[in-house]
UniProtKB/Swiss-Prot annotation:
Name of the top EC class for this enzyme: transferase
UniProt function note: Kinase that can phosphorylate various inositol polyphosphate such as Ins(3,4,5,6)P4 or Ins(1,3,4)P3. Phosphorylates Ins(3,4,5,6)P4 to form InsP5. This reaction is thought to have regulatory importance, since Ins(3,4,5,6)P4 is an inhibitor of plasma membrane Ca(2+)-activated Cl(-) channels, while Ins(1,3,4,5,6)P5 is not. Also phosphorylates Ins(1,3,4)P3 or a racemic mixture of Ins(1,4,6)P3 and Ins(3,4,6)P3 to form InsP4. Ins(1,3,4,6)P4 is an essential molecule in the hexakisphosphate (InsP6) pathway. Plays a role in seed coat development and lipid polyester barrier formation.
GO BP, one annotated term: seed coat development
PANTHER family noted in UniProt: INOSITOL-TETRAKISPHOSPHATE 1-KINASE, INOSITOL-TETRAKISPHOSPHATE 1-KINASE 2
Name of encoding gene: ITPK2
Taxonomic source organism: Arabidopsis thaliana
Protein name per UniProt: Inositol-tetrakisphosphate 1-kinase 2
Length: 391
């Protein structure tokens, strides 16, 4: 079989006669107009336009003359990209939506599930490995694969991911980011780690200069719902109700709005989410104990269309975000992450980073599918240019 040809003005009978093909000829209208290609099994089959079909009218195929097809230059430069993925079932369901897979296929990007029961090096070949699995064993598998296949882009390196799964190391180095020339100031809330005996940590909290109320977060992010549970501790005695290991972070009033900054390579998208309301001095004096609050980053908590005070709702300045993300990509060594930011209440451009997440819930982001298709296309172009340079 020589390939699948797109239907056009040429009649099937004339194709059969000129090419000497009988039942082996497949005729299809194609479905990949953007790249003019179809994917069948493991083969990319070129879509042929009217110009090329006219040229083929002059081709005579017989037993001694093999059929050859020369792709136009613009088709030769558009490369197929195979993305092997290793995701939890929940992440696969939320990320690999039908629309994403359809748009990707139209651009020559194909997602292939990695079989966790087989050696990774025996699978593929892959151009990109996209993963979000926890555990030392998987981390070792990916690191070994990277050493054996340096030509494959791994999103993202396990060592870099591990750093932000620990809330103590997650925000380290933020103070050293070079943002002095930007239209905003960046801080991290004062925090401390409690490894055991939360009740006995009350004195350490005072010594560290932290002021109540405190946001309490589990130290480790392990993919469970419990690792994302957040509490607000109003006084010293309430610390005894918390289970270590955990991070205690000073609560910063921020008008009840949080900014989720999504990063996909060089692309930045920002969404507003409802968060905890401000805590007044009067409330601090009257309220005690621990308050467990829901995950304020949930899709239901979107504040993008809410009627908010403009001083609270105004997004962080674009130059500030661009500089911050550029520095963080370098510091963290990640390309897929999001930043949870708040603006200090009463200020215009004083911001705090309170959390960083690897490979977050992009499915909540409008038009995330096109963002990722563009991202993978860029990876394909970079790989193509590297191959051309090495020739």
């Amino acid at each position: 079989m020589f390939g699948t040809l797109a239907s056009g003005e040429i009649e099937t009978a004339r194709l059969n006669r000129n090419l000497g093909i009988t039942s082996n000829l497949g005729v299809s209208c194609g479905g990949f107009e953007d790249f003019a290609m179809r994917f069948e099994g493991e083969n990319m089959v070129p879509y042929k336009g009217e110009e090329q079909e006219e040229e083929e009218d002059q081709v005579v195929v017989n037993e001694t003359t093999p059929f050859q097809f020369q792709q136009p230059l613009f088709l030769q430069q558009q490369q197929k990209l195979v993305v092997g993925y290793a995701l939890t079932s929940k992440k696969k369901k939320s990320f690999l939506q039908p629309k994403l897979e359809l748009l990707a296929r139209r651009k020559g990007i194909f997602f292939v599930a990695i079989d966790l029961n087989r050696p990774l090096s025996e699978q593929g070949p892959f151009d990109v490995v996209l993963h979000k699995l926890l555990g030392k064993e998987w981390e070792e598998v990916i690191e070994d694969y990277q050493q054996k296949h340096p030509e494959v882009t791994v999103l993202d390196p396990p060592g870099s991911i591990q750093r932000i799964y620990n809330r103590q190391s997650m925000l380290q180095g933020m103070a050293d980011l070079k943002l002095s020339d930007c239209s905003g100031s960046l801080f991290v809330p004062k925090q401390m780690v409690v490894l055991k005996d939360s009740a006995a940590s009350a004195d350490a909290v005072v010594e560290a200069g932290l002021k109540f109320p405190l946001v309490a977060k589990p130290l480790w992010i392990d993919g469970t719902a419990k690792s994302h549970q957040l509490y607000l501790a109003y006084d010293r005695r309430s610390l005894a109700e918390l289970d270590p290991p955990l991070v205690l972070q000073e609560f910063v009033n921020h008008g009840g709005v949080m900014f989720k900054v999504f990063v996909v390579g060089d692309v930045i998208k920002v969404m507003r989410r409802f968060s905890l309301p401000n805590v007044s001095n009067c409330e601090k004096a009257k309220v005690d104990g621990v308050f467990q609050f829901p995950r304020v980053s949930s899709a239901a908590a979107s504040a993008d269309n809410a009627d908010l005070d403009p001083r609270v709702a105004e997004l962080p300045p674009k130059p500030f975000l661009e500089a911050l993300v550029k520095e963080l990509r370098s510091l963290l060594g990640l390309r897929l992450f999001n930043i949870d930011m708040i603006r200090e209440h009463g200020s215009k451009n004083v911001f705090y980073v309170i959390d960083i997440n690897y490979f977050p819930g992009y499915g909540k982001l409008p038009d995330y599918e096109q963002v990722f298709v563009d991202f993978f296309q860029n990876l394909a172009q970079v790989k193509y240019k590297k191959r051309q340079h090495c020739k």
